[in-house]
């Protein structure tokens, strides 16, 4: 964003549209500014001064900073499994493993304009006059393109990638992402807890180069995620900071059993 007036009572965002917050006539929805030293007013909060490379922390009552444990995540993805449509990665099983403590730095660097399920707008334009659409949809007054949040475990172009009795905890974005072209795979008896974004993502939703209002209809049906089984898992405290996220989000998929 850029400051418009001084003193800094008014702020103009760099991209005039889409607006960083959903609005109706005369009413602005809430938006949030973070990581300012002036906002450090509640025990348990912290502030990172990027310029001086110092971290400031407001201790909780009774907390001894001489013995306190601090974990600072430095990586966004712990495990990445990716093949191709013609040569998918197959038959991997993870059992009784804890995946924890990841970060996701994009919102801190570029901001975060979420749409749904943690997907964020990378670009958008207003259309005037509005575009007429079929299927009884209302006329379209904008176009937008989406990005996909990072994940602690990312799987793409693969088959039979299983997770059994694993823990996914304290994560800076998505827990597990079966992104695209994943066939089969069991997630059974797993715990998803204390996660900033989605617990589990399955399916492509809207590829980066695909305008988000257009129906997703890939020419190669192998791109569609199919036959995943999510069984006897426990999801709690997901969407902790990105409130538009979900425990389980599955989009443009086939034959999934939850």
What residues fall within each predicted segment?
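Structured core elements
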Residues: 12, 56-57, 177, 199, ...
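Short, solvent-exposed turn/loop segments enriched in Gly/Ser/Thr/Pro and often Arg
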Residues: 179-180, 203-206, 246-254
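Extracellular polysaccharide-degrading/modifying enzymes targeting complex plant/algal/animal polysaccharides
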Residues: 4-157, 162, 209-213, 217-219
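Right-handed parallel beta-helix
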Residues: 90-101, 139, 159-173, 182-197, ...
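Short glycine/acidic-rich loop motifs that flank beta-strands on beta-rich extracellular proteins
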Residues: 103-109, 150, 172-178, 196-202, ...
């Amino acid at each position: 964003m850029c400051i418009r007036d001084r003193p800094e009572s008014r702020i103009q965002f760099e991209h005039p549209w889409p607006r960083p917050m959903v609005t109706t006539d005369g009413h602005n929805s809430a938006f949030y500014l973070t990581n300012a030293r002036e906002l450090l007013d509640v025990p348990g909060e912290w502030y990172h001064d990027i310029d001086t490379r110092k971290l400031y922390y407001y201790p909780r009552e009774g907390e001894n900073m001489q013995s306190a444990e601090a974990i600072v995540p430095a990586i966004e993805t712990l495990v990445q499994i990716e093949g191709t449509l013609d040569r998918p990665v197959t038959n991997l099983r993870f059992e009784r493993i804890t995946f924890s403590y990841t970060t996701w730095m994009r919102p801190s660097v570029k901001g975060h304009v979420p749409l749904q399920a943690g997907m964020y707008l990378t670009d958008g334009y207003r259309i005037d006059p509005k575009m007429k659409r079929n299927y009884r949809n209302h006329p379209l007054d904008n176009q937008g393109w989406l990005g996909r949040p990072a994940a602690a475990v990312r799987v793409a172009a693969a088959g039979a990638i299983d997770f059994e009795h694993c823990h996914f905890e304290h994560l800076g974005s998505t827990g597990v992402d079966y992104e695209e072209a994943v066939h089969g795979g069991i997630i059974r008896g797993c715990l998803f807890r204390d996660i900033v974004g989605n617990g589990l993502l399955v399916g492509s939703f809207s590829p980066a180069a695909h305008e988000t209002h257009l129906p997703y209809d890939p020419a190669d049906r192998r791109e569609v995620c199919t036959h995943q089984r999510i069984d006897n898992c426990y999801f709690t405290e997901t969407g902790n900071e990105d409130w538009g996220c979900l425990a389980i989000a599955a989009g443009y998929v086939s034959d999934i059993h939850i």
